């Protein structure tokens, strides 16, 4: 048996002897070398595959919070995942968030998480910036995951503030100071999920580090304007506000959910100058995507477009049939040609979906 690299993904060639002849078959195998057998490896932040500077991250205008698709048994569907990432590259996205909220990092083991970051780097790291979500409400876990993420080659880390077991402002500063020295970092402020706002004082303190690439900000455009006036790079974390954030409040771009579905249109929204007509055209889709907590609607939409299997890791479940029917209408209004995939959009029945509780 021998191995080879095709498109930077791992393939294995088997030699098979039959009736005195020898033939070779090639089959794809997931990059097991990237799987960390023990989470607590003695890696250090200087042991990295790629060395990226914060300025390289600061320039990105369209970053997609990429979806993680699944096989019927709940394991990662890497073939579908690779298709999703390739479609982002082909349609002009400059970066992907791996294992974020949209990618359901909260439903992954750390072994899965680091493997997926490493796989994305190995297959696509030369074509798109790979930003690994290695944040945690435990500083200890955030340190270990970030060390390992940089060790397998991610270009930057995404860090949320500690949630549920909230800490003081001094605790927030200490938490972020523990991970910032490792490499380029985006701090993610989403109080609706964490229960705690990261105030500007904390970000201003973190901005003293050369590794702070910027902030993914979900509080609103007043906060975006405050940071941009202070010279802090900001990405809008709200798709429905990103056009105004970009062109009226100085945001560098967006870290987007909607771009999973219409990456080309989202690129146009971020690169092409003010375009209120396009923004209005996309607004029904954006509102539909966030009718229920993300990523429920996105998972449903990608399944209806036929680009991922209709498999959900619980506790996420698909949208109601009425909302699935509404999505078909939205696709027709925007134009099927603007969405990823080649199949006609479908209205899936309830029994088409697979819900996996053990994964």
Curated annotation (Swiss-Prot):
Record has Transcription as a keyword: no
Major site of localization recorded for this protein: plastid
GO CC terms: chloroplast
Subcellular location as annotated: Plastid, Chloroplast
A Pfam family hit: DHDPS
CDD domains: DHDPS
Keyword Cell membrane found: no
Metabolic or biological pathway: Amino-acid biosynthesis; L-lysine biosynthesis via DAP pathway; (S)-tetrahydrodipicolinate from L-aspartate: step 3/4
Listed name of the protein: 4-hydroxy-tetrahydrodipicolinate synthase, chloroplastic
Source organism of this protein record: Nicotiana tabacum (Common tobacco)
Lineage: Eukaryota, Viridiplantae, Streptophyta, Embryophyta, Tracheophyta
């Amino acid at each position: 048996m021998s191995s080879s690299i095709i498109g930077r993904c791992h393939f294995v060639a088997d030699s098979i002897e039959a009736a005195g002849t020898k033939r070779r078959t090639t089959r794809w195998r997931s990059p097991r070398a990237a799987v960390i057998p023990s989470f607590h490896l003695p890696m250090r932040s200087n042991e990295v595959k790629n060395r990226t500077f914060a300025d390289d991250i600061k320039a990105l205008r369209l970053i997609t919070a990429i979806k993680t698709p699944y096989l019927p048994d709940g394991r990662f569907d890497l073939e579908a995942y690779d298709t999703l990432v390739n479609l982002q590259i082909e349609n002009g996205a400059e970066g992907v968030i791996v294992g974020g909220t949209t990618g359901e990092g909260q439903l992954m083991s750390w072994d899965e998480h680091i493997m997926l970051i490493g796989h994305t780097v190995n297959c696509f790291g030369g074509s798109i910036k790979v930003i690994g979500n290695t944040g945690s409400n435990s500083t200890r876990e955030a340190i270990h995951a970030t060390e390992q993420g940089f060790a397998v080659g991610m270009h930057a880390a995404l860090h949320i503030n500690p949630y549920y077991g909230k800490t003081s402002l001094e605790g927030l500063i200490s938490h972020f100071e523990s991970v910032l020295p490792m490499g380029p970092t985006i701090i993610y402020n989403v109080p609706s999920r964490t229960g705690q706002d990261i105030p500007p004082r904390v970000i201003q303190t973190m901005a003293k580090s050369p590794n702070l690439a910027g902030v993914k900000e979900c509080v609103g455009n007043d906060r975006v304007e405050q940071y941009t006036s202070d010279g802090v790079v900001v990405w809008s974390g709200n798709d429905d506000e990103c056009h105004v954030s970009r062109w009226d409040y100085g945001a560098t771009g967006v870290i987007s959910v909607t771009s999973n579905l219409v990456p080309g249109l989202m690129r146009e929204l971020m690169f092409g100058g003010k375009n209120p007509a396009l923004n209005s055209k996309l607004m029904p889709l954006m509102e539909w995507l966030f009718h229920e907590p993300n990523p429920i609607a996105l998972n449903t939409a990608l399944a209806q477009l036929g680009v991922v299997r209709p498999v959900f890791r619980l506790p996420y479940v698909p949208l109601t049939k009425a909302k699935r029917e509404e999505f078909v209408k939205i696709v027709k209004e925007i134009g099927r040609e603007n969405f990823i995939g080649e199949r006609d959009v479908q209205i899936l029945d309830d029994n088409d979906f697979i819900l996996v509780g053990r994964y």
